[in-house]
Amino acid sequence: MKVIHSIKELKEYVHQCKREGKSIGLVTTMGALHEGHASLIQAARKENDVVITTVFVNPTQFGPNEDYEAYPRTLDADAKVAAAAGADLLFAPSPAEMYPHKDMTWVEVTGPITKVLCGRTRPIHFRGVATVCTKFFNLTECDRAYYGLKDAQQTQVLQRMVEDLFMNVELRLMPIVREADGL
C-alpha cells in the first residue's frame, strides 16, 4: 500500500487509475482505525479495482470548545490496518493541503436533518463533513464511497448532498461492525 500526503500525487494516481479504466472505492476516515473501518475497506476491496482510504482529522468539523488538538493521530498504526484490510492507497493530507486559503468555499446541507441530534449541539459539524467529503469525492473521482450505518445522521446528510449536487458517486452504507469488547 502506498501512503501519500499531497493532492498533486493523489491526482496523478487517480488519473492513472481512470486511464486504465479502473473503478475506485473510497473510505474516508479521521484515523484511529479499528475493525469497523477495516470492514468498510474490505467491502470496498470486493467491489472495486482500487481502494483509497483517507486519514484526515478535519478541523472544519470541530466547533469552539471541541478538542481538535486532542483527537488521536495514529498514522503508522492506521496504515497497518488499512493495508491489512486491502487498501491500495492511503491519502493523509495536512490541513494546509486540504484548506490552503483562509477564505474558502463551503458545502452545507440545510434543513431538519442537520438541526437535530448531533447537529443541534454542533451547528458547524456537518458543514465541515460535507465540505471535506465533497473535496475527497472530487479528488479521488471515486465510483463508490463506503460509510458505516453507525453514523446514521452523517450518512443521511451525505446522501442528501450527493443527490442535490448530482454527484457521480454511489454511497454504500454498510452494517455496523463492533470490536470484541463491543466498541
Outline where the language-model segments fall.
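Nucleotidyltransferase catalytic core that binds NTPs
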Residues: 1-183
